[in-house]
Amino acid sequence: MIDLQLNGYKGVDFNGDGVSTDAIRRACLAYRADGGHRLLATVITDELSTMAARIGRLAAAHREDPTVRDVMAGIHVEGPFISPEPGYVGAHPARHVRPATVAAAETLVAAGEGLVRSRTLAPGPGARVAGELQVNEGRCSRATTTARPPRGRGGAGSRRVAG
């Protein structure tokens, strides 16, 4: 089993401030013992600097610990470029949701030391440019949105067919 969005496991919160390499290793060992194989450790919306620090701790644990390296296939960054609207923001703190910028996206990716494998963002101001950054890296995931496609044009995931 591969879990593409795991916020923590068996009492270890990957979004906890100061989570240690030892705690991350314990979570990985428990995940394996319960039948899991690989996972993407997920960091959710918060202040940009807080998210970067959390991503950095996960990357450091991956670099320092062979068990973590074996289990954690990478990092999934969920937010902060998501919709702040009720019903869409989910469990994310709406006060930390922000429009996407390439600089902010690059800050989060750099903190991951090459381990950011997936990012979730919603359409909105700056999302096209930040999304192109994802596509150029060869990875992209979708988020729900309140956006509606213009009349006569396809929605998310559609493509124009010649003919």
Stretch-by-stretch model annotation:
Residues C28, A52-A59, A105, A130:
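Generic structural signal for well-ordered alpha-helices
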Residues A60-H62, P66-M72:
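A glycine-rich helix N-cap at a beta->alpha junction
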Residues N7-D13, R25-R54, D70-P84, G112-G126, ...:
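Divalent metal-dependent hydrolysis catalytic cores, especially in the metallo-beta-lactamase
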Residues E78-A100:
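Flexible glycine-/small-residue-enriched beta->alpha junction loops
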Residues M51-A53, E85-A91, A130-G131, G152-G154:
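Short acidic, glycine/serine/threonine-rich loops at helix termini
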Residues I2-L6:
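Metallo-beta-lactamase
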Residues A61, V97-G163:
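Histidine/acidic residue-rich metal-binding segments in metalloenzymes
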Residues G8-D22, G90-R98:
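Active-site mouth loops of central-metabolism enzymes
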